Swiss-Prot record:
Keywords: Carbohydrate metabolism, Chitin degradation, Chitin-binding, Glycoprotein, Glycosidase, Hydrolase, Polysaccharide degradation, Secreted, Signal, Virulence. It is found in: Secreted. Its EC number is 3.2.1.14. Secreted chitinase involved in the degradation of chitin, a component of the cell walls of fungi and exoskeletal elements of some animals (including worms and arthropods). Participates in the infection process and directly acts in the penetration process of the host cuticle. Pfam families: Glyco_hydro_18. One of its GO terms (molecular function) is endochitinase activity. It comes from Metarhizium robertsii (strain ARSEF 23 / ATCC MYA-3075). Residues 392-408 have a biased composition (Polar residues). Residues 39-402 form the GH18 domain. This is Endochitinase 1. Belongs to the glycosyl hydrolase 18 family. Chitinase class V subfamily. Chitin binds at residues 103-104, 130-133, 173, 238-241, 379. It comes from the Eukaryota.
Amino acid sequence: MPSLFAQSLAIIATLQATLGLATPVSAPDTVTGKHAGGYVNAVYFTNWGIYGRNYQPADLPASQISHVLYSFLNLSNNGTVYSGDSWADIDKHYPNDSWNDVGNNVYGCVKQLYLLKKANRNMKTMLSIGGWTWSTNFPAAASTAATRSNFAKSAVTIMKDWGFDGIDVDWEYPADDAQAANMVLLLQAVRDELDAYAAKFAQGYHFQLSIAAPAGPANYNKLHLGDLGKVLDYINLMAYDFSGSWSNSSAHNANLYANPGNLNATPFNTDDAVNDYIKGGVPASKIVLGMPIYGKSFQKTNGIGKPFSGVGDGSWENGIWDYKVLPKAGATVIYDDVAKGYYSYDNRTQELISYDTPDITKEKVTYLKSKGLGGSMFWEASADRQGPDSLIGTSSNKLGGPDTTENLLNYPDSKYDNMRKQMA
């Protein structure tokens, strides 16, 4: 006969499975850097991707993903967080959605992501707020206790109404020390609100809190890194966009290291940023290495680190190409073994495109493991290939599979009837 302890564990496990509860997030393993549940393999999913790109939540390789960072929610200067596209988020009816449901129900990407969570219990969803376009109001929203409280309460309200597992703040970027200090206070307010909600409605569950963070020293040197390391679960390091139309020379987009023999090709590098974050007081296990699923193009250039003239067109905006269309026909793929970065070059058109490949993704995973980092992050899902050349899948396989910490399915305080019923 099982012991009372064993019987108790069995009862708890049954309740978790029945009610959609999940085990708390484990503390980091200080030897490997990863959390006890495994490595993060996170990806940003953009709600605008459902339009021209025709990339829907069901297209996500959910079994290979630990966190979906759903982008973006907007915010007002008084701290109120709100949907910037309610049709995409909560109104769009997908083929299996009924128009005759009774009650107040949620649809759109939110419902689709919840259904993915039900089918893939290790995939967590994070509500990502801000982004490059919608960061304007962060300074005001973080400036007073009242606006910080409003931000935290409104963000957590949307999170629980939509059935998400945490909040990701994408403030690009605090401009000075005062804003950096207020950022920490804002995040602490969110942490407190998440914990208060969990204590009341999801006891034992740890809602996660992360940020998207810069890899350029001019931006991260302003941050209070040690304080961020204490309040956050993860820091998603945006180790890309090292070059572009603003650059003086064609250069790598997301290289691991500097190339002393060709510094024009490596104005920034990932390793310096990672080391600076760790020196600044961020536990290595909380740093998630961001990788691009796109390439940066340079026109009329004689090679990497050389002058260029324009960036040309792109998949959706000038100078930026989805990984899934690269390399272009006629281009040769070249590896910079010093900087650890790939690019394609067409001798005829003199177009150079710097982008990540499956091989460099494997190399980056090896790197992040050696540094004790928490895992991988990708921007953004719609640009990836399917099949064996998927960058998301390549990372997942090299990591040994994504973090197995379970998501939450039970949201008894959601304002939506079908969410409270777990879409049953």
